[in-house]
Amino acid sequence: MGDKESRASYLLAMPETTLTDRALLRIAGDDPRGFLQGLVTQDMASVVPGAPQWGGLLTPQGKALFDFMLWAEGDAILVDCEASVAEALARRLSIYRLRRAITIERSEGAVHWAREGGEGVPDPRLPALGQRWIGDAGAAAKGWLAHRLSLGVTEGLAELGSDQTLWLECNARELNGVSFTKGCYVGQENTARMHHRSKVNRRLVVAPLGEAGDRTRATYPELGLMVELRRVEALGDARVPDWMAAALA
């Protein structure tokens, strides 16, 4: 069997687990943890091998710009983010680098997901989301989007927006995406104020919609703001997810 045939057989045998819309940034150099500690919503002390954490980079007003997973890789940190915004995120982080000897660059490898199984570690936002790990790229995962939305979990630029949605309105508190004990970071003041006053007036929720005619309903403030219409089969009835109901009880 030739090299091309061998490679084709190998790829066909690989499980369909790669999240092809994700990319990895590697932050290394002079204390990357300390660099990120003053920027992101997550406490970098909790980012240890085998325990990635979900967090965000906010505006000074506490609105989401980027969300991502943070992975420990030796002394470096891997940022698992949307591929479409990876370059923009790298540029944004570089603004804060100043003269610190920090490198921010694309990393090889791919992000993988499986709904269940022994591979990887539980998604830090919600264990029901499944397992997540980093490895060589393979066949594209199937079912991730529908599974995530069926659990009422939002992520990414299209759903969270950029400088549109306050971080706690993204359900960051309920999905373990913020530390209230770590100290200062960009957007911390407004985020902490909302938390301590227990005042989150709006929240992102996932609800199935009908055909395009239902788009007009989103123009009425009393019905809420629809950030994006996505067609996904078998989402089920609109409801407050169990994890959110339990957190708000």
Identify the function of each model-found stretch.
Residues 2-249:
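Basic, glycine/lysine-rich polyanion-binding surfaces/domains
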